[in-house]
A protein has these predicted regions:
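Conserved N-terminal beta-strand and adjoining loop/helix that marks the start
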Residues: 36-56, 78
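Short hydrophobic targeting helices and cationic amphipathic motifs
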Residues: 5-10
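Cysteine-centered motifs
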Residues: 14-15
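A short gly/proline-enriched turn/hairpin at secondary-structure junctions
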Residues: 69-72
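Unchanged
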Residues: 75-175
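Charged phosphate-binding loop/patch that engages nucleotide di/tri-phosphates or the phosphate backbone
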Residues: 168-199
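Short, Lys/Arg-enriched N-terminal segments with co-localized hydrophobic residues
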Residues: 23-34
Length: 199
């Protein structure tokens, strides 16, 4: 009890602790700088999420007004498989879980197409110094209907299901719009298997 009262009421003890904390923080400051988020890997995915009727999901970015897009995201590690990147980003940005009962793993299809583009200036600080180009791999994800979406509010603030041409017109990025406009051809070449069946 005496020790408790001493710690609670002794101003000198509080001052020493405060000074120690400030001195310790000063010594750790260089290390804290080094522990910042690592640079983004300049290799990413774009996932066009659509229904059998070719309605397409587009989501609105939180950091840019009127910037609508499909799901996108970079690899977490250099050796991360692109399909894993795609599934992770879909779950993080929309709440849609690939491998669930109504969205089987086979619904995610690698379109075997990639583009390289110049990174927008406002995003260059996220990459290592000197990195100005990103390679993007395109995927399609067919869902059974216009499913409800749970956004990550830090990244996106709104979403819409639109006919594919309207979705393409709303996209900020020309390459994203191009991917969506290719949807009729790409979707028609796929055989969407019933859940539980295999090729």
């Amino acid at each position: 009890m005496r020790l408790f009262r001493f710690l609670r009421y002794s101003r000198s003890t509080c001052c020493v602790l405060g000074d120690d904390a400030r001195r310790t923080r000063g010594r750790l400051a260089p290390y804290e700088t080094k522990m910042t988020k690592p640079p983004k890997i300049p290799e990413s995915v774009l996932v066009v999420i659509y229904t059998p009727e070719l309605d397409v999901l587009v989501i609105k970015r939180a950091d840019q007004p009127d910037f609508w897009q499909s799901v996108t995201g970079s690899k977490d590690t250099l050796d991360e498989p692109l399909a894993v990147t795609a599934a992770r980003e879909v779950a993080e940005e929309t709440g849609i879980v690939i491998g669930a009962a109504d969205v089987p793993a086979a619904a995610l299809v690698d379109w075997q197409h990639r583009i390289e583009y110049t990174i927008y200036p406002q995003y260059l600080h996220r990459y290592a110094p000197g990195v100005t180009r990103n390679t993007e791999h395109w995927f399609g994800l067919c869902v059974p209907r216009r499913v409800d979406v749970t956004l990550s509010p830090r990244e996106h603030v709104d979403y819409a299901w639109l006919p594919y041409r309207d979705a393409a017109a709303r996209c900020f990025s020309p390459s994203n719009a191009d991917a969506i406009l290719q949807l009729p051809v790409r979707a028609s070449s796929l055989v969407h298997l019933p859940h539980g069946s295999s090729a």
